[in-house]
Structure formats: C-alpha cells, structure tokens
Amino acid sequence: MGTSRDPRVRKMTVLGYGFPDPMTRRIVRLILLSVATSASAADRVPLPLELPKPLFVGTPVPFKLANLEQPTGVKRPPFLVPAGTVNLALGKPVTASDTDPLIGEIPFVTDGNKKGTEGTYVELGPGLQWVQVDLGAPATLYAIVCWHFHAQARAYHDVIVQVAGDLKFKTGVRTLFNNDSGNTAGFGAGKDLAYVETSEGRLIDAKGVRARYVRLYSNGNTTSALNHYVEVEVFGRK
C-alpha cells in the first residue's frame, strides 16, 4: 500500500489514528508521550539552592517518634526545575500567628540568611503556630525549602505546608506536606514522615501548583514546645 501524499493523512498515521489495531495506536501514543516527556526533562535544570554550612553544636538530645524518617547520611540529589526558576520568597512580606516572637523578628523568615546562628532565626511561642509568606502575585511553584532550626538534631511536630490564592486560607487551599499523623492540627492525618533538621533544610515538591500565599505550620519540637524558623524559600516562576 502506497503512502498518501495528503499531509493530513500522514499526520493522522503518525499520531496512530491511521492504524486500525488499538494496540498499535496505544504504542504510538506512548512513544510520542515519551518523546514529549524527554524534551520537557531536557529543559530542566538543578534547583538554584545554596545551602548553609552544617551547624550542629552541643550534645544531641535523644528522642523517639513513631513516624520519624530515618536519616540516610547521603546528600540530597539535585532537584530539577524549569530554567528560570528563582526564589520568589526572598525579601517578601511575612506574617505569623504569633505576632510577638520570643526571639528574633518575623521578617527573618525571608531575609536570605540561613546560617541558623543567634540573630538569624525567629522563635514563636508554644503550641500550633504558623508563618505565611506573601509572594506578591500568583506564581507557578516548583519547590519550597524550609529550615526550622539546624543548629541541633531535632524534629518538629505537625509540620504542614499549604499554599493558596486566598490571604485567609479559606478557599482553594492545597496541602503539599503534612506529617501530623494524629491530626492534631485538624487538617487531616498526614502521611508524610517527621524528619530531623539539618543544614539541607526540607525540600518539598510543589508540583507546579499556582498560588500566591505559602503557609507553614508547626507545633513544637522534640526539644521544647517552641517553634522556630531560620528561612523559607519558595522557588517558582511568575
């Protein structure tokens, strides 16, 4: 059988519609999807993330948590994002549930200083607390990185990361991370694991969600009932 000279027919054949066999059409579509996925991956670059120096000081306090992620001791692999992705949170306004921090200032959360030493973190009161970053406009988000307190090996309770287009987080809320396994915060039992703080921070895949506001919850830690934030970075594109 000769090849049709009609470009519309050739296009249909390439897309799989010219094949009567359903299996053949399925295979062709999978091949095209694979090619498109490969092209998309080729456009991605490592996340432009600068890590602070390790800062563990003193004697670690032993603790046990039922849902604790076991440290691997292996450096986190590069996280790929579209080219042009930047930290949209740098210098952006921050609000918090505790408006009178015990230590530090709320703007420390997005000031770009991730050292974790005295004068670079904010300490909020006990119980469930949150900080919220206003990116200024809706953006496509790819990763959120949070450093609570990396001068000591500790884990924070009920860590929940949500994004929304609504300032009050009443509508259109998306939960990207939740390790509140007991539903203490009331957002549903989380399936993510608690983790030990390190200078790498915790990288959360934002999966390309569109949002303007980012809110992070915590409920004390394995050392005290207080809540801390060294830095929050939100990587995306406007």
Please name every model-derived segment.
Residues 2, 16-18:
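Residue-identity detector for glycine
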Residues 80-113:
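Predominantly extracellular/luminal regions of secreted and cell-surface proteins
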Residues 42-58, 97-99, 122-130, 138-139, ...:
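Trp- and acidic/polar-enriched beta-sheet ligand-binding modules for extracellular glycan
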Residues 12, 25-32:
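Sec-dependent signal peptide recognition
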Residues 33-41:
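Hydrophobic h-region of N-terminal signal peptides that target proteins for export
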Residues 41-85:
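N-terminal pre-domain segments of enzymes
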